[in-house]
């Protein structure tokens, strides 16, 4: 069933609008899909493509061609006889590609390739090649214009349809690349059947694999016998909601040949723009506005579809498809498709561009303004499905891994053409060749753009693969690197709007529909495969009461949320080539019997990047924490997180280090909230704005670095015979586990104390484990800054030096900035469900020792959870706990049920002193260990380091765990922790002496104990009270040397208890207490019990580290330098955003936050003495005026200064039209009628009176009210009235002259009013508010106005109204007034006190009256006394009243060609004295006076419940982001406004979080208007309270918090949306600084 599409249409600010019309399939429509083989689709309820899909912009809809190179070129597989003319060009093409395969960095060859394709009119390929040439140093001056011309040609071709069916002469570069690469691999000489002997060349560290890798054919397709064909997903697959379990893949094909050489890196600009991929046959890419056509849905036989279903993807990355080719058949509305595939039912429907009745607030405004880019036809831009579809709860595995994994690209997409035997390359003929529409829809913005808060998981691949499915993707053809899309698209601006509103709200309002679906059948426990998945709580959009769904949902949801984290965040990139190459060649599982008949392999639920499992509707802050994640970069956990292939990592036939995720896979089961490692997390330098490393922490780092250098120098001098410890970075490459994308860098930097010895451990372990069939697991994160581990087993490292130990601590501390990036983490893994040893490179992880979990479970089998399990719980309440319990799955492999500790309640957050005590104890332990190592080097080879140390008794392990295991041991751990806290405080007071450790062994037992204590305990730096004090307890009694470097060391902000905590990272080779169950990211050290942080920036904490040396011992005492807490009332603009967040976070505000946005100390109003009685002549002052004699005068800066001088309320500029040669005839009545005679005119019917009088109807007294009635007509009809009144006036004049009439003032032929009126007033009609905003209809008129000086123009950088972001009729557009004598514009101030420009077109004159803004309150009082509303009423001042009140009135005549500048806040009223036309618009010059008055009126309007037409808070933030302000007064005002706005948002947010109300992130899109409360018309900035009108699913209304709470005190039925992440506002606030005066204007 397809919900009818409502026609798009304009809306008034208060009108509701239909959201339903924006959905292609309807978020709530029941879409009976075609069930894929062996699986049943849920009945329609939730199978729409709405929630969870990222808005995909489609500036250039491609055509549905079947060639991988060109949409309209027949598809020729390698080896297929293809008609290839121009053999010379082909030879040249092959030669270039062969040379580039050897060395991609040859701009000349890339340019040559581009010229080849350009000569054959293949602009897409040419643009790609030119981009590559630029990437490798080509001349931008030469290539830039060429690229622009080609892209423009593509655009024109799309509109003209000229190249829709043009066959290409040259084969696509991708085909050639892959073909030659296959030959290259055949010559590579590697044996099939095992991992490659030799690792291919290292790619550049910072260069991720080109997006081609995303969709590159996995080895199983490109190289395996059954895979040499394009295997796309049918439309059914495309319809599979994201994250559903997949049917089991077929038996894995034989291992592929060795990996290819690294592909050329992507274009440099792609780090922040989505990777682009060529259009595939049938590919539904972001530019297809088209849903799959019915003819394409069922065209493939079921068996072929089943094959495609079962063919797993080997690559977890989405391939955002991008094509610049026009659609060959039809343009379909640009459905904002997202990570989630659309259900089959939805596939067949496109959004028809019907007209929508006027609608309101949220969605239509977004959608109407997200008409995509101008290059898209209206049909193509009709936004469909503003929200991605919610995943059906509990849907059994129904589709192939390819369809289910939103980000795993159909590897067939790239390069490997279908076998010649496959009939019909045309995608309509052979849907088997289609790429998964789902994947194809994962366009660039699918990952770069934000997703709705509750997106159905989709972007993360959940492909479950036979754990070892080997595949070796060919090097991605550079062709896949599409040129960056238009900026609007890159930002997901226009297209995001389409999907981000309705369905997400529908989800929140109406919950998930449809009967619960049973979880996928458990997979029989078999070696090398994941254990049977238990249903777990869905992280999709359904309510918390919905049935559990397969674990896949969690990871996908997390992934989708992680995408949404950054509106501007980088888009997902492929992993570095060495990771990508090693994905496939992993050992295959020992169970090749898995067939399509087997129950679906439970999809690996990959780590939730601390993204909120935002679908659970529990009222907790944790669920939407992700919306504030300060790390937009993690917006792409589309990394090797997919379990489709073994995690990428160096694997070779010869013994060599293998990433822990590879070797120890058998010990690992599917984890509920594992973190998908983000390959680019380390690949690219993190944007400075997100390096939330506080200054204090940075200082600690510096101090530690200095100490490290000193220690290294000393050690090198003292131990000349001992080699210095190897750099910590090298072991990291091999040991780095797949860590949560949010915290991957943390583990990368957080080197455990034994980092120097872990290389050996890992090597041996992984070698042994290499032979075991690992289950499909997320690969370890790429280590951008670290080379892959060395191939030969490294020799045992030398004794650890103080330098290396301090480096470890530094790493721990530095890791905090990365941990902070995981702010909204809803990272919860099933506690105790699977031991974390699979990523701990100790042999105990499956090969030589039983996998240790925690000390208690492994040694005694006791159910106590390990340390890491304690961090796996979210304290956010029931739904999370249910999710953990439901998501637990036993891990296969050596893990026995006895070893799986049951989940326990969340331990209380650690205290500040505990945290700091841990740091000091860690430093101390490090130094002690170093001392022992130097004295007794044999210790370095102790069992701990080698990873073979027997497990200590549980009690000992508990002691050694730094108190964390104890704290996590059971429900009573909270009390024990509190006791420990008190002890630590006492110890801190002592500062030197005893070690208040519960059950700690005496100093005699120190040696064995400290072996495990080297792990540094659990530096729970992310705990709730992370910023607490840290007072250490030194071991030494006598202090010989004390160094007191004081360093501000603010660890990242505390994590509220309501947030789930990321897992801790056990140190490899340590005792079992570190190897407690944890997510796959748990790998290096238990040092980091990562807790998700609150949204605000970290609190700065100054820590003084005191180094105490006594004999051979060195102790660090860490003590907090107390800082005064900042109160919210003490905040000033000098404080940074972190201070603002911290001060306002815990502020308790009673009632509504009502602080002013203006500081009273910043007024710039002129001083006007109102007490002095002015003489009569001064009550009629001369009007400031300027006569322009030349164009030079008009553009003089003096004119701007004069007009905007606060002392001049109004300025008349004479002769402007003549000096600028304005053609005012364009605005004459005759021209207007010719241009658009049927244009609407608002008519005001008035009584004609003298300009300085205003009589009542009886004509007996003057009054203030000036009433008029409103009606409408057209320009043509009013022109007739205007002309006839002029003729009648002329005739009356003649008659009056002849008869000496006593009524000389009668100038109209209409009958006089019948009311008793001695003056015999006449009725006149005033044509007003004629909108000239249509740039096409009024193009000549609007272009003529561009001749004006910049500050007077309708649009300019210095005009605040140009930064509103949307149209305000009459303010930032031109309006026309058609007048007859007596037409009155009653008294008023401009909207929000903005300036105004008015030009008299003529031929008659107008008389103006004006009063300075200073007197508006007096005039308002007059209006009140006369019973008329000052702000909204119609009044005409009595001049005598004003004079009596000592108010001077400026009075002057505006002649044709004169321009009147009405300064900010000026009260004015106008009457026409002749027949004339006027044009007018508003201007907001960036002056302090204008800004102050605008904000004053903004606040006054709120008091009077009047709508502020200009959304000043929204405008202020936009100005702060885009304009350099050099005026100090203006800068202070704007900064203060931003400060108040941040405080308001934070206070409001914290109150909602405390109340347990979810806040859903929904980023803004281009041209999205500001929102106003539907009831009180106040601007609603950032945090929107949305309700469904009358329970309707199609209409949503925005409210302010006050009105929302009046409707429902507990906000039941109200969805809270957040449009800006806290980090976005903080970044903009801090970046807004005073610019040098020289750059002013």
Curated annotation (Swiss-Prot):
One of its GO terms (cellular component) is nucleoplasm. Keywords: Chromatin regulator, Dioxygenase, Inflammatory response, Iron, Isopeptide bond, Metal-binding, Nucleus, Oxidoreductase, Phosphoprotein, Ubl conjugation, Zinc. It holds the Pfam family KDM6_GATAL. Residues 214-223, 312-326, 396-415, 552-568, 743-766, 855-879, 1306-1317 have a biased composition (Low complexity). InterPro entries: Corepressor-Demethylase, JmjC_dom, KDM6_GATAL_sf, KDM6A_B-like_C-hel, KDM6A_B-like_GATAL. Residues 974-987, 1002-1014 have a biased composition (Basic residues). GO terms for molecular function: beta-catenin binding; chromatin binding; histone H3K27me2/H3K27me3 demethylase activity; metal ion binding; sequence-specific DNA binding. The keyword Nucleus applies. The modification Phosphoserine is found at residue 224. It comes from the Eukaryota. Residues 293-309, 361-372, 704-713, 918-931, 988-1001 have a biased composition (Basic and acidic residues). GO terms for biological process: cardiac muscle cell differentiation; cell fate commitment; cellular response to hydrogen peroxide; chromatin remodeling; endothelial cell differentiation; hippocampus development; inflammatory response to antigenic stimulus; mesodermal cell differentiation. Residues 42-89, 188-682, 704-808, 824-1085, 1286-1323 are annotated as: Disordered. Its cofactor is L-ascorbate; Fe(2+). Residues 242-268, 467-488, 597-613, 645-660, 774-801, 891-908, 1047-1066 have a biased composition (Pro residues). It is found in: Nucleus. Its main location: nucleus. There is a cross-link at residue 1107 (Glycyl lysine isopeptide (Lys-Gly) (interchain with G-Cter in SUMO2)). The keyword Nucleus applies. Its EC number is 1.14.11.68. Histone demethylase that specifically demethylates 'Lys-27' of histone H3, thereby playing a central role in histone code. Demethylates trimethylated and dimethylated H3 'Lys-27'. Plays a central role in regulation of posterior development, by regulating HOX gene expression. Involved in inflammatory response by participating in macrophage differentiation in case of inflammation by regulating gene expression and macrophage differentiation. This is Lysine-specific demethylase 6B. It comes from Mus musculus.
